[in-house]
């Protein structure tokens, strides 16, 4: 619609321009009739005012089919009208000039000049011919024409084209042969080799296509049958594909047996195109997961699964078995879960509070604090009975401490037991106990080597030197837990104390007598034997096994750190068992 409106506007502009030219010419001739001198306009201005033939040709050919005929008629009318106008004007001007009594010679001269000027403009001669010739071969159909009429006209044209071709049917070929023989007999014409070749063709394929109705499917089938469409690259890609994607497992019989992957029909293709074949295609595992629950898995002689049953299918079955077994299995926890539990164990506020309270309580017992050493047992599993024994041992030691320390110690021990029981009853399980053992084993690198005596306690020099009534009962209580080097040091210090009778009290002498009767009778009686230095040297010169030497070096390191005042807090095995024991 926009094109139509534009064309109409252009035509109106051209027509208005032509009318303006007419009016200007009429006014000029009127003025000339009034005046004696005829003013003829210049050539270029007149040519510029008139529409050009190139514009009309392009304008007529650019429109739609329905508007071409209208443009052709309009262009013809315009040119004919322009040709008639100058003739009429010339006659009118000549008639007016003659009527006014102007001499004939002057009129004739002016008329000749005007005609010469008009001869320079050939548009009047060209405009007589139409812009678009009405050729009967070119036919334009309107948009309202039906499809049936168009098909009929097309069929007629195809028939005309086919009739113009050389006929190659049998009857026509025989007639053509007779004609050639007749011409040869007369020796007038000779048969051309092209015509003899046409005789050999019975039916032309192009003629066959145009004689029948147009059908795209027939053309496609004919093209696919008569041409080579598969290239080498397509065949190579098809061979390099995964057999799981190409072959469907539905049509495989159960009785078919395959020797193996090396004897399979795909072996040569995988060897030939090993670079182009993908190692792990995208849809491979998706197909395998779909086929896990199918009955074809039980068939060991499957063609497509012969190669995959060694690796992928075993893994898939193992995954299924693990998923089914996981809620019923009672196996050890992974190290990641242990680390997670250990982190929670270290961040637990109840554990930190209990640890601070135990350290405070041990500091109240005397000037020298008994170190709390975290000792991890070497065995991976500790039964419930062992935990109870450790807790009972801790309680007996706590009762002994309360006897010698007085009422304050008893109160602290009772508070400690209540706190420990609350912690153990609410917060600890067997898993956390195992995780804590692993954690303690990694922290205590020195105690990790000591697999025999993990419950040893080394006293600080202040606690050993204290001559009160608290240190000696603790020594009598925990004397059996000391190592050999610690015993030697304690014997030396006890002998020094006995040599000074002023410093020793009667209670301490009684306790030392009990200690001599109970513990020192097995080794050497240092009170009766004056040569105690010789006995100590003999004990030190004994031959020790290699594990004992490593243990002694560790103990020596601890003793040096204890003497320098850098000893860390330690706790015994019984205390650790008390902390992690479940509620009774």
UniProtKB/Swiss-Prot annotation:
InterPro entries: DUF4553. Pfam families: DUF4553. Residues 353-375, 502-511 have a biased composition (Polar residues). Residues 353-379, 400-426, 463-565 are annotated as: Disordered. Residues 516-535 have a biased composition (Basic and acidic residues). This is Putative uncharacterized protein ENSP00000382790 homolog.
